Amino acid sequence: MKAWQRQFIEFAINKQVLKFGEFTLKSGRKSPYFFNAGLFNTGRDLALLGRFYAQALVDSGIDFDLVFGPAYKGIPIATTTVVALADHYDRDVPYCFNRKEAKDHGEGGTLVGSPLQGKIMLVDDVITAGTAIRESMEIIAAHRAKLAGVLISLDRQERGSGAISAIQEVERDYGCKVISIITLNELVAYLAEKPEMADSLIAVRAYRDEFGI
């Protein structure tokens, strides 16, 4: 685990974005941890979040031309990511996001920002069922652009209803790489370094043993 990944985990815990306990997921599973990126909700939070996304993008080595944020949660993530790329890596990358509803006045259409063209890096908070990715792929394909990759905050590394995860399904269906700032394995490694979090470590490991990929 890299130092910036450890810092991201601590950032998420401090902001109560990452919590430990017992949580019922939409799937009905009882999870010993919960990640709610919506609680990154101040200017300072977003500035720091953008730096982590930018760091993960640069480290990945994936070649891309534009950052796309699917509505709604992906919009501030895309914005803060390109600001961080400009401020910290001297990379002036265009960005774009979609509206859920098309406008029939002003600039019109469903897209806001730079033209959706070239190699697209899609950014979002998490992938649960992959629905937002599939909707975004329809938009990207309609503009004859190509999906270069997907970046999310946390890869839960757990099976969906079948034998593979929603992330693995996206990689299989669209032939792209899905990367994350942290994975469940890195979260387990972090907990193992913290004696005071031993109970959470036991619960998360048991969950990974049952549902992990």
Curated annotation (Swiss-Prot):
Its EC number is 2.4.2.10. One of its GO terms (cellular component) is cytoplasm. Pathway: Pyrimidine metabolism; UMP biosynthesis via de novo pathway; UMP from orotate: step 1/2. GO terms for biological process: 'de novo' pyrimidine nucleobase biosynthetic process; 'de novo' UMP biosynthetic process; pyrimidine ribonucleoside biosynthetic process. Its cofactor is Mg(2+). 5-phospho-alpha-D-ribose 1-diphosphate binds at residues 26, 72-73, 99-100, 103, 105, 124-132. Orotate binds at F34, F35, T128, R156. The keyword Glycosyltransferase applies. Keywords: Glycosyltransferase, Magnesium, Pyrimidine biosynthesis, Transferase. GO terms for molecular function: magnesium ion binding; orotate phosphoribosyltransferase activity. SUPFAM superfamilies: PRTase-like. InterPro entries: OPRT, Or_phspho_trans_dom, PRibTrfase_dom, PRTase-like. Gene3D superfamilies: 3.40.50.2020. Pfam families: Pribosyltran. CDD domains: PRTases_typeI. It catalyses: orotidine 5'-phosphate + diphosphate = orotate + 5-phospho-alpha-D-ribose 1-diphosphate. Transmembrane segments: none annotated. Belongs to the purine/pyrimidine phosphoribosyltransferase family. PyrE subfamily. Catalyzes the transfer of a ribosyl phosphate group from 5-phosphoribose 1-diphosphate to orotate, leading to the formation of orotidine monophosphate (OMP). Homodimer. PANTHER family: OROTATE PHOSPHORIBOSYLTRANSFERASE 1-RELATED (PTHR46683:SF1). This is Orotate phosphoribosyltransferase.
